[in-house]
Amino acid sequence: MRLLVVEDEKSIAEAIQALLADKGYSVDLAFDGDDGLEYILTGLYDLVLLDIMLPKRSGLSVLKRVREAGLETPIIFLTAKSQTYDKVNGLDLGADDYITKPFEADELLARIRLRTRQSSLIRANQLRLGNIRLNTDSHELESKESSVKLSNKEFLLMEVFMRNAKQIIPKNQLISKVWGPSDNSEYNQLEVFISFLRKKLRFLKADIEIITTKGFGYSLEERT
């Protein structure tokens, strides 16, 4: 499991890194808000420990930008006892928890276990790329602002794209997975359902799109 610690006091950051590494976590460090935001937006982290008082950009500003980008990475604020107002603000902006410095190692580890466990349960029924989630229980495509229901064929097709994101998938493979073994008559249907999905992605203002590779197949890509 990969964690990020965003803390400007290097000695504290390195102590947390050593504690977590000893428990088997992979831990990266950032020492200011700008770097922390850049790291978080990669989407590589299972959880972030984020200090509120940071150089260049505050922890509250980092959190706001992360949630605006549609990322739901669990974030635990590291706060001082005097920062009650910031704690409330942070929770209102979408922080998952906070822990007051100085803190006990066991308390920090317990909070990390709780938040990553809850996040894993949420992710179990979701596939995600960019700012779009596919809910495999409700068969809905979701963005931060809205959601759309998919038909059975649309869902099966989108699930293949999400599970094979950024890979070109041959047309015959898509047809086999969605319609089963069939003849060439299904190719027109495939194009129709691709068109339906593209319209729904545009409605959601998605930053991902279905790309056609002429004569071969399709891929689901993030917009550049």
Swiss-Prot record:
Compartments annotated for it: namely: Cytoplasm
What is one GO biological process annotated to this record? regulation of DNA-templated transcription
Q: Which UniProt keywords apply?
A: Cytoplasm, DNA-binding, Phosphoprotein, Transcription, Transcription regulation, Two-component regulatory system
Maturation and modification: Phosphorylated by DltS.
What SUPFAM superfamilies does the record tag this protein with?
A: CheY-like
Disulphide bridges in this chain? none
**CDD domains on file:** REC_OmpR_DrrD-like, trans_reg_C
Predominant subcellular localization, coarse grouping: cytoplasm
Question: What InterPro entries does the record tag this protein with?
Answer: CheY-like_superfamily, OmpR/PhoB-type_DNA-bd, Sig_transdc_resp-reg_receiver, WalR-like, WH-like_DNA-bd_sf
The answer on whether this UniProt entry bears the keyword Zinc reads no
Reading the lineage from the top rank, the first entry is: Bacteria
State a GO cellular component annotated for this protein: cytosol
- Provide the Response regulatory domain boundaries: 2-116
Annotated Gene Ontology MF terms? Answer: phosphorelay response regulator activity; transcription cis-regulatory region binding
Keyword Transcription belongs to the record = yes
According to its UniProt entry, what is the function of this protein?
Member of the two-component regulatory system DltS/DltR. Regulates the expression of the dlt operon.
Report what the protein is called.
Transcriptional regulatory protein DltR
In its UniProt entry, the species of origin is given as: Streptococcus agalactiae serotype V (strain ATCC BAA-611 / 2603 V/R)
Taxonomic lineage from the root? Bacteria, Bacillati, Bacillota, Bacilli, Lactobacillales
